[in-house]
Amino acid sequence: MPIKPVLTTLIALLSIILALYTIQLPSSRSLSSIATTIGALAKYSTFFGHKHHHHHHHHHHHHHYHHHEPIKCCEKWTSRLRHQYKTSLVLTVDLHGCGNFSNVQSAIDVVPDLSSSKTLIIVNSGSYREKVTVNENKTNLVIQGRGYQNTSIEWNDTAKSAGNTADSFSFVVFAANFTAYNISFKNNAPEPDPGEADAQAVALRIEGDQAAFYGCGFYGAQDTLLDDKGRHFFKECFIQGSIDFIFGNGRSLYQDCTINSIAKGNTSGVTGSITAQGRQSEDEQSGFSFVNCKIDGSGEILLGRAWGAYATVVFSNTYMSGIITPEGWNNWGDSTKEKTVTFGEHKCYGPGADYKERVLFGKQLTDSEASSFIDVSFIDGDEWLRHTNIVSEHTSKDIGDDLIGFY
């Protein structure tokens, strides 16, 4: 470096140091409040700026928390949120004790049973390592995280450790009218090889009716998301897995979601499948519909396998990368299912959407055939969905602005 810029820099530094000496320093009390504010802002800026730094959050600034009485600093904030969310009760969860609870299950346990009004649980950034149950009495519960890359609930059971696939969940919902925003559900069990026994590992199992997930993440490998029964809505979610990673007998609409395969690549053909839908008879009103989604990742994967004889899966206006195998669909080794399944694609695009080599029981749907799958009427959402999207008029940025008053 030439000498002149070095001298200029030194002079500038010296003048700053001199200036600091001549300014009267504030009291230590206001300094600590400035530090706390900066701490909160720094934490918040990582939420909207560099999302991938979320794993640092819970190491910073917790030494400031003892300056606050948590209830005192959030009175105004909770009343504003209560008004905004139309909830009767707001509970907060924070790993460092700056909320009402330090784990999610404890907060869920105090939710009033069979409540007709909503309870909001706000979960601060961090990885909450616990196996969580929302039992059927905890109706009308809303859980709000700080972004799906910042707030996660994680466990690592498998079918082997839990005794069966369904009980390997990290988070299960049995209650009706459950809503989650901006939070992740993870199963951290190792990714199995295709065909490995008892390695299924569920991140989220949903059995409650009328559930909605906005901006949530679901992370696992085999059997990530057990969409078991009931009507469900997934909006702008991130769903990761390898084998049958969206499965079950739910009736669900997936809108604007990212489906990310982590299936292993190999030379012997198929290494994974997105869906395994469980509809068993004509009478069952179940099925999975994907609209405006994006499929990407690794491996050679199927759009779906016919788990149930009447399995129903439709992809509309969805981008499919080259990881989708040319045949697209699989009969689960039973050719009789080919007559009864509904496997459809409608106006999909991308290298994986080429249907020239699709199996005959995978259909390209007309507009009229697709129409019953592509909007919220598929899940009777016009009746119940508006009650879940209680912050539709606010972006997550606005919610974040409110949260900063507390954290």
Swiss-Prot record:
The record marks Q222 as: Transition state stabilizer. It is an enzyme of class 3 (hydrolase). Keywords: Aspartyl esterase, Cell wall, Cell wall biogenesis/degradation, Glycoprotein, Hydrolase, Secreted, Signal. It is found in: Secreted, Cell wall. Glycans are attached at N100, N137, N150, N156, N177, N182, N266. The keyword Lipid biosynthesis does not apply. The active site is at D223 (proton donor), D244 (nucleophile). It catalyses: [(1->4)-alpha-D-galacturonosyl methyl ester](n) + n H2O = [(1->4)-alpha-D-galacturonosyl](n) + n methanol + n H(+). GO terms for molecular function: pectinesterase activity. Its main location: secreted. Pathway: Glycan metabolism; pectin degradation; 2-dehydro-3-deoxy-D-gluconate from pectin: step 1/5. GO terms for biological process: cell wall modification; pectin catabolic process. The keyword Nucleus does not apply. Its EC number is 3.1.1.11. Residues 1-22 form the signal peptide. One of its GO terms (cellular component) is extracellular region. Expressed in siliques. Substrate binds at T165, Q200, R305. Transmembrane segments: none annotated. Acts in the modification of cell walls via demethylesterification of cell wall pectin. Belongs to the pectinesterase family. This is Probable pectinesterase 15. It comes from Arabidopsis thaliana. The gene is PME15.
